[in-house]
């Protein structure tokens, strides 16, 4: 089974946990600006996906509260039987009329998916 994990820089990020293996990674560009990052991951068994709250650059680092961490059961994520099924869904998510939306494939092993453009 495959799932799509999403992260929105400055808002939240999902992190891999044991039982999830990253297969492909994509940046979502909206009119040339990266607004999200997606990872297609293979799900070996039911897990709880780690979701970490992030803070934007507008929040002063010294007054920033500790991030909230949640664990979301994988049963709540849409699951795909094949890698191609997950790719097709990601493509569908990145298509909306004539808007300038692009998926850019990234190195799945890159550590800092939050880097600015």
PLM features: residue spans?
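Short aromatic-glycine-(Arg/Gly/Cys) micro-motifs in beta-strand/loop hairpins
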Residues: 1-74, 92-95, 99-111
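A structural signal for short, well-ordered beta-strand elements
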Residues: 78-79
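Short amphipathic alpha-helices within nucleic acid-binding modules
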Residues: 84-90
């Amino acid at each position: 089974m495959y799932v799509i994990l999403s992260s929105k820089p400055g808002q939240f990020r999902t992190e891999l946990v044991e039982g999830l293996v990253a297969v492909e990674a994509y940046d979502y560009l909206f009119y040339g600006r990266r607004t999200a990052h997606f990872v297609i991951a293979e799900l070996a068994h039911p897990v709880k996906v780690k979701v970490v709250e992030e803070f934007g650059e507008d929040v002063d680092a010294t007054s920033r509260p500790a991030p909230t961490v949640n664990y979301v059961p994988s049963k709540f994520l849409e699951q795909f039987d094949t890698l191609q099924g997950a790719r097709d869904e990601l493509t569908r998510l990145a298509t909306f009329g004539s808007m300038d939306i692009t998926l850019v494939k990234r190195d799945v092993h890159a550590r800092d998916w939050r880097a600015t453009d």
